């Protein structure tokens, strides 16, 4: 959500709020797109747009909002970077099937370097509930990468 903030506002009782950071208008900053039917990989939301944001971190230096997903709407959850100046949304990380992005942290300055850190938890959880989708994914993985999934 994006908020317009201002001072000089009053609460519902008419008392002045002692802050210059009072939200006076709110709108959706980034929205995803649900699909009417799942795509060929089993995604219930457009994989090129955000779904179920869960963890966020803002980097003032990069002017970027980092957003981790925890969604049953994407087969693989993603970590996104949204530049607040250009309004560009970029997918920068994909977790294993069923895992969620967590532990998100952006460090603006350590010895001249900037770091974006993230990890994931409970990989494979999706596999237990969506075996037909996993079989489709496994076929595509074998075709494209000559690999196979680890079955739990």
Question: What does each model-identified segment do?
Answer:
Residues 72-73, 123-125:
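Short glycine/acidic-enriched loop and turn motifs that connect beta-strands
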Residues 60-61, 108-112:
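Residue-level detector of Asp-centered blade-edge/turn motifs that repeat once per structural unit
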Residues 88-107:
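Conserved blade-ending motifs and adjacent loop-strand segments that build the rim/top face
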Residues 64-68, 113-118:
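Conserved beta-propeller blade signature
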Residues 150-152:
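Conserved small/polar residues in nucleotide/adenosyl-binding loops
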Residues 2-3, 82:
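Hydrophobic/aromatic beta-strand positions that recur at structurally equivalent sites within the blades
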Residues 43-86:
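Loop/turn-rich, solvent-exposed surfaces of beta-rich toroidal or solenoidal domains
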Residues 13-48, 93-97:
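Surface-exposed loop and turn segments in beta-propeller and other repeat-based domains
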